[in-house]
Amino acid sequence: MIFGIGLDLVELEQIRQTLERQPRIVKRVLTAEEQNRFYTLSDKRQLEYLAGRFAAKEAFVKAFGTGIGADVSWLDLEVLNEASGRPVMTGPFEGTIHLSITHSDHYAAAQVLLEKRSSDVSTNLDRN
C-alpha cells in the first residue's frame, strides 16, 4: 500500500552558489558514507551528486509528510548506489523506499514512493 509520494526539483546553479558560499552544506546534508563518495568525484559530478541527494531527501520528507528538521534530519537519510548504479535510500521508515534520481545540465530531480505492507496499515473500516 502506498504511504506517500514525494517529488523535488532543484536548480544545479542554486546548489553551486550555496556550495561556494557555504561549503559546510556537504557535512550538513550528506552522511559520512555519502561524503566519502562525494570527495572522489570531479567538480561537475560533485554538484550533480549533492543536488541529487538534496532532492532525494526533500522528496522523502514530502512523501513522509514532514519537513527536514521536524521529525527527520538530513543525516537520518542516506542515499547510496548499488553496483548497478541504482540509488537506494535508507531512513526512518518501516517499509520500502522506492527512489529515482535524475539530472540534466541545469536541474536535478528525485521522486520517492513510500510503500508499506498491507498488514502494517491500520484501518478504521466499519466491519458491520
UniProtKB/Swiss-Prot annotation:
Keyword terms: Cytoplasm, Fatty acid biosynthesis, Fatty acid metabolism, Lipid biosynthesis, Lipid metabolism, Magnesium, Metal-binding, Transferase
Gene3D superfamilies: 4'-phosphopantetheinyl transferase domain
Coiled-coil ranges (or none): none
Amino acids binding Mg(2+): 8, 58
Domain of life: Bacteria
Signal peptide positions on this chain: none
SUPFAM superfamilies linked: 4'-phosphopantetheinyl transferase
Localisation: Cytoplasm
Names of the cofactor(s): Mg(2+)
EC number, as in UniProt: 2.7.8.7
Catalytic activity: apo-[ACP] + CoA = holo-[ACP] + adenosine 3',5'-bisphosphate + H(+)
CC terms in the record's Gene Ontology section: cytoplasm
Function: Transfers the 4'-phosphopantetheine moiety from coenzyme A to a Ser of acyl-carrier-protein.
Protein's name in the database: Holo-[acyl-carrier-protein] synthase
Organism expressing this protein natively: Exiguobacterium sibiricum (strain DSM 17290 / CCUG 55495 / CIP 109462 / JCM 13490 / 255-15)
Designated gene of the protein: acpS
